[in-house]
Design a protein with these regions (language model features):
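Divalent metal-coordination and catalytic microenvironments
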Residues: 34, 157, 198, 244
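Acidic/histidine metal-binding catalytic segments
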Residues: 169-172, 208-217
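Cytosolic-facing loops and C-terminal tails of multi-pass membrane proteins
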Residues: 4-12, 16-17, 75, 79-110, ...
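Short acidic/histidine-centered micro-motifs embedded in hydrophobic/aromatic stretches
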Residues: 37, 175, 215-219
Length: 294
């Protein structure tokens, strides 16, 4: 049982990272969708496996059987989960739940920043705040840093974040990384992909790739010089240097090899998620069957 659950869990994480290596060869919108699905799917596979191990271990404990009315035949009717593995699974699930709660709380705190709190600040800050309605917050310091054409880029970039609902992708990726810390690199890739997507939308809006590259570079340099950390859904966000380099090049296409490797990773991830789901379902069905539960 343990190996049957650990194997698809490992395959899911490896497949996710393998497919994620294709990020730079995909259009930013495709990369955002692909990476988000990969991170969410890999986290789901890992959590399903941990839940199955934790449930299997709990079902073997006589004390819990008396409390919940489980039948004793469970203890001798299937492969037992070793105590270190079972306890580790429960600890990992608890840590995941706490980590996700903390991550979501911190993100909500950032999103509560109001226009009044930031607009008059001398620090160069610009970011989008999702909601109904969503809003774009640009500080006085950022406006003074950029010329009029570059300001237009900033607003186009931030409105793209709102229009494309990029916060939803970030929520999934952040929750996945909080639940499974191994997936933190994928979360960073999703943040970078959403910024690249907004950059390309800004290019469509202003019609000048070099202008967008210059605006991104100046915003990032000003923020760095002021000690301002990159903000989610902000033009000074993830990977400014790599974004500028991408903007200085013409838009790239997608090769057959890229699609093939990406598809292979997605298939491997899907199989792993399905495998862990089936294993968990079989465990629950097994307990219900031999205990005569309905």
């Amino acid at each position: 049982m343990v190996l049957n659950l650990l194997f698809p869990m490992v395959v899911a994480v490896v497949a996710a990272f393998g497919a994620a290596r294709m990020q730079r060869r995909l259009r930013p919108d495709w990369a955002t969708w692909t990476l988000t699905v990969l991170s969410g799917g890999a986290a789901l596979a890992v959590l399903w496996a941990l839940m199955a191990l934790a449930t299997g271990f709990a079902a073997e404990q006589p004390g819990l059987a008396r409390v919940f009315g489980w039948c004793d035949v469970v203890f001798s009717s299937h492969d037992r989960v070793p105590a270190p593995v079972g306890i580790g699974a429960w600890a990992a699930l608890l840590a995941s739940a706490v980590s996700v709660a903390i991550r979501l709380h911190r993100r909500r705190e950032v999103m509560r920043m109001t226009h009044e709190q930031v607009a008059g600040s001398s620090e160069p800050v610009a970011f989008a705040v999702p909601g109904r309605p969503g809003r774009v917050v640009v500080s006085k310091g950022m406006l003074e840093t950029l010329d009029s054409a570059e300001r237009r880029v900033v607003y186009a970039h931030e409105h793209s974040h709102l229009r494309r609902h990029h916060h939803r992708f970030l929520h999934v990726a952040d929750a996945a990384a909080a639940a499974v810390p191994l997936l933190e690199p994928l979360s960073r890739r999703v943040r970078f992909a959403t910024e690249r997507w907004a950059d390309e939308d800004a290019v469509v809006e202003v019609g000048d790739r070099r202008l967008v590259a210059r605006a991104v570079a100046r915003a990032a340099l000003a923020s760095s010089a002021s000690g301002v950390h990159p903000t989610p859904l902000g033009i000074n966000g993830s990977g400014a240097r790599a974004r500028v380099e991408a903007l200085m090049l013409p838009p790239g296409g997608v090769t057959a090899a890229t699609l093939a490797w990406g598809s292979l990773g997605m298939v491997g991830l899907a199989v792993s998620v399905a495998g862990t789901t089936v294993q968990f379902h079989h465990l629950v069905a097994f307990v219900f069957h031999i205990c005569g539960l309905h």
